[in-house]
A protein has these predicted regions:
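Active-site-adjacent, His/Asp/Glu-enriched structural segments that form or flank metal-binding
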Residues: 54, 63-176, 195, 205-223, ...
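Bacterial N-terminal signal peptides
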Residues: 6-16
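Positively charged n-region of N-terminal signal peptides that target proteins for export
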Residues: 1-4
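Scaffold signal of the M16-like zinc-metallopeptidase fold and its non-catalytic homologs
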Residues: 87-89, 110, 114, 118, ...
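Acidic/histidine-enriched alpha-helical segments
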Residues: 94, 98-102, 150-168, 179, ...
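Proteolytic maturation boundary segments
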Residues: 20-47, 225, 233-289, 293-298, ...
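Extracytoplasmic
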Residues: 29-34, 39-41, 53-58, 62, ...
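Structured mid-domain segments that build the active-site/substrate or prosthetic-cofactor binding neighborhood
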Residues: 284, 289, 293-294, 298-376
Length: 472
């Protein structure tokens, strides 16, 4: 990902059907095409036959555990454990997991991978579906990662150099400046001091017991989801999940971690330059309480947010295409800070000789919209474009990729994003889009583009910023 600060607002896709005129208080339940449920130990599963792409199966083990769960002596160990999962389990010691998968034509990197973030660790497999036995074996591998990683001392010591080299890569200017933004965005929260890459001194010196302590406390079935999407038999997959995960036990002494992100009164500002920076960036983030769409009626405000972002994007695109554009590009979106807060993000790539002008133009445009709102013409155009997009997604629903679906189910597990299906979502758009009026959108703008919870951060090259300061 080029920048954490670039957020593209995507219309999410799934597959469920409800009749027209859905009552606003209707709870949006999961798509009936998904075999969805929980084992008695709390493990969640999502199983979904899907034929696009053909003859492929996608697997995920999603764990609600990341760097924010680390103790002060474990900084970086959530990510380190992710590496260790590929270094041997009770049934597949040493490199046998990778050897087994690669012998079946599955490549490490594109089809075998994992990632760790602040609040989650995700293990991913993608396989051809022509060997039904391989599906069961991949579910077994997920089960091994969930509870039976060996964590041999020699393997830990061998892996230190690999992870420390990743840490070194994260010391480049782009990461230093990104961390400055995150420090301001996560100010006064646990996230501000829990970067997933960790602290090098801890990576160099931690003991096996510290790593085992993290694994045993946070890798529990009530914090896990298993997802299998693709060319599969759902009943067989469910049976295999039950076989490999039902015996897993929870930790009765697991702690509750404060994962809140404060929404400050007023505006937080920051400027940071770096002699190794290669570009200049301005970010405006506005934090608001976490917003969900659990009920059908919630979709109306959700659609208003989409229209707002799309119309703001059009405004900034017009500035970019002007005769003397004040910046090179701008990205606008709406996203979540985990399950703690939601936020609007404007990210602007600034010209070397126009940092001050670019920031001023961006802030002035936000102020103009806040004061005067949008026009009826802008709203009608945005509504027509959004409806056209949703119609296209609905018409092409049989070509919804398994990768897209599994990403959506991951968001459902981590953020409670509803997964009712594209049929239901299409009905909701058709139901609510015609009802949304300009006054409603502009009222949303007035309430949303406020100074509380606002974070303004500019980063880049010293020579481009000159004497620009936060006060100026």
């Amino acid at each position: 990902m080029k920048k954490f600060t670039t957020f593209l607002f995507l219309v999410f896709i799934s597959i469920f059907t409800i009749s027209a005129d859905i009552a606003p208080d209707t709870v949006l339940t999961p798509d009936s095409a998904i075999t969805f449920g929980k084992l008695p130990n709390g493990l969640t599963y999502y199983i979904r036959p899907n034929s696009y792409p053909e003859n492929r199966v996608f697997f995920r083990l999603v764990v609600k555990s990341g760097s924010v769960m680390e103790d002060d002596d474990q900084l970086g160990l959530a990510h380190f454990f992710e590496h260790m999962a590929f270094n041997g389990t009770e049934k597949y010691p040493g490199n046998q997991v990778i050897d087994f998968l690669e012998k079946n034509g599955i490549q490490f990197g594109p089809e075998i991978n994992a990632y760790t973030s602040y609040d989650q660790t995700v293990f991913m497999l993608e396989i051809p579906s022509d060997k039904s036995q391989l599906v069961d074996q991949c579910i077994e591998v997920l089960g091994q990662w969930a509870a039976y990683v060996k964590l041999e001392q020699q393997d830990i010591d061998d892996e230190r150099g690999v992870v420390i080299e990743e840490w070194r890569q994260h010391q480049r200017a782009e990461y230093r400046l990104q961390e400055f933004l995150l420090d301001n965005l996560f100010k006064d929260s646990r996230f501000a001091v829990r970067n997933p890459i960790g602290k090098v001194k801890i990576l160099e010196t931690f003991t096996r017991d510290q790593l085992v302590r993290y694994y045993k406390e946070w890798y529990t079935p009530d914090r896990m989801a298993v997802m299998v999407i693709g060319d599969i038999d759902a009943a067989s997959v469910k049976s295999s999940i039950e076989k490999n995960f039902s015996s897993l036990k929870n930790n009765p002494h697991q702690r509750i971690i404060d994962m809140s992100v404060p929404i400050e009164a007023g505006t937080v500002t920051g400027i940071k330059t770096d002699p190794e920076a290669t570009e200049n960036q301005f970010d405006m983030c506005i934090k608001v309480p976490f917003q969900q769409n659990k009920l059908a009626g919630d979709y109306r405000s959700y659609i208003v947010r989409i229209l707002f972002c799309n119309m703001m994007s059009d405004r900034f695109d017009q500035l970019r295409r002007s005769q003397n554009p004040p910046f090179m590009s701008a990205n606008i979106g709406f996203s979540h800070l985990f399950s703690s807060a939601s936020f609007f993000n404007l990210g602007v790539d600034l010209k070397d000789n126009g940092v001050r002008e670019g920031i001023e133009k961006a802030c002035n445009e936000i102020a103009r919209v806040s004061q005067h709102g949008f026009t009826q013409t802008e709203l009608e155009r945005a509504k027509a474009e959004l409806l056209s997009l949703v119609e296209s997604l609905h018409n092409e629903k049989d070509k919804t990729s398994s990768a897209s679906l599994i990403n959506e189910y991951t968001r459902n597990f981590m953020e409670d994003e509803p997964i009712p299906g594209i049929d239901t979502e299409y009905e909701l758009y058709c139901q609510y889009l015609p009802l949304i009026q300009l006054e409603e959108v502009n009222s949303f703008v007035q309430n949303y583009l406020k100074k509380d919870g606002r974070v303004l951060v500019a980063t880049g090259k010293p020579q481009s910023f000159g004497d620009l300061t936060e006060a100026s």
